[in-house]
Swiss-Prot record:
One of its GO terms (molecular function) is NADP binding. NAD(+) binds at G8, A9, A10, G11, R12, M13, D34, G98, T99, T100, A122, A123, N124, F125. Its EC number is 1.17.1.8. Belongs to the DapB family. This is 4-hydroxy-tetrahydrodipicolinate reductase. (S)-2,3,4,5-tetrahydrodipicolinate binds at H156, G165, T166. It is found in: Cytoplasm. The active site is at H155 (proton donor/acceptor), K159 (proton donor). GO terms for biological process: diaminopimelate biosynthetic process; lysine biosynthetic process via diaminopimelate. It comes from Pseudomonas entomophila (strain L48). SUPFAM superfamilies: Glyceraldehyde-3-phosphate dehydrogenase-like, C-terminal domain, NAD(P)-binding Rossmann-fold domains. NADP(+) binds at R35. It catalyses: (S)-2,3,4,5-tetrahydrodipicolinate + NAD(+) + H2O = (2S,4S)-4-hydroxy-2,3,4,5-tetrahydrodipicolinate + NADH + H(+); (S)-2,3,4,5-tetrahydrodipicolinate + NADP(+) + H2O = (2S,4S)-4-hydroxy-2,3,4,5-tetrahydrodipicolinate + NADPH + H(+). PANTHER family: 4-HYDROXY-TETRAHYDRODIPICOLINATE REDUCTASE 1, CHLOROPLASTIC-RELATED, DIHYDRODIPICOLINATE REDUCTASE.
């Protein structure tokens, strides 16, 4: 059995991850961690996820359970994830990282850690989204400079980063396929007298409202026709199942910084 620890276990995504781990053959939750000031520390993780008692108590320090897990799943905040990364690197533990909002410099820290431990880092662990990335690469290569490209994403009102990590990853895939640098061609929102659109730019539009789990559309607009590639998530469980799948896939892997394209053999 692959022994899995979940960081941020008392949160919405954490609870969903606990459920996904317990539902997956070959995986088992052996540690659950949350912030030290959480009033839920000491509670049974299974009960937090409405699964009933499973005998794994929520703790407040990763060091307390270092011998209890093989791989840590972390969907928290960049500052928290980087601390956990340093811990897992020192302890020789594998990581699944679904946290978004990292800076370029912080992503480099992930790459450095990948030289010593196996890591799967992805902006989105949904199988559908990762298939979409493959389709986006194909579409961009075929359509080339003959289209305007816009990325529209929507998430719930509590999401703190924008554009979403998934939208940015979609932009990176499209830009790379076209031989462009996303940092140079991205346009984040428009207002006022913007002038005519530069065809080589990639536009981003962000919506934050209600309880939207995650909608992403990439629009390729030409004269007389347009192509839209859309993915809509209706449940966080799709991300959680992908993360657990990645945790099982990492078993026995050499150190490296992998992503879901590797897990799904889409390269």
């Amino acid at each position: 059995m692959r022994r899995i620890a979940v960081m941020g276990a008392a949160g919405r995504m954490g609870k969903t991850l606990i459920e996904a781990v317990q539902q997956t053959p070959g995986a088992g939750l052996t540690a659950a961690i949350d912030r030290p000031d959480s009033s839920l520390v000491g509670a049974d993780a299974g009960e937090l996820a409405a699964l009933g008692r499973i005998g794994v108590l929520l703790c407040d320090d990763l060091a307390k359970v270092v011998d209890e897990f093989d791989v840590l799943i972390d969907f928290t905040h960049p500052s928290v994830t980087l601390k956990n990364l340093a811990f897992c690197r020192k302890a020789g533990k594998a990581m699944i990282i679904g946290t978004t909002g990292f800076s370029v410099e912080e992503k480099q820290l992930l790459a450095e850690a990948g030289k010593e431990i196996p890591i799967v880092f992805a902006a989105n662990f949904s199988v559908g989204v990762n298939l979409s990335l493959k389709l986006l690469d194909m579409a961009a290569r075929v359509l080339g400079d003959d289209v305007d490209i816009e990325i529209i994403e929507a998430h719930h009102r509590h999401k703190v980063d924008a554009p979403s990590g998934t939208a940015l990853r979609m932009g990176e895939v499209v830009a790379n396929a076209l031989g462009r640098d996303l940092q140079e061609v991205a346009v984040y929102g428009r207002e006022g007298q913007t002038g005519a659109r530069d065809r080589k730019t990639i536009g981003f539009a962000t919506v934050r409202a209600g309880d939207v789990v995650g909608d992403h559309t990439v629009l390729f607009a030409a004269e007389g026709e347009r192509l839209e590639i859309t993915h809509k998530a209706s449940s966080r469980m799709t991300f959680a199942k992908g993360a657990v799948r990645a945790a099982l896939w990492l078993d026995g892997r050499e150190p490296g910084l992998y992503d879901m394209q590797d897990v799904l053999e889409l390269r």
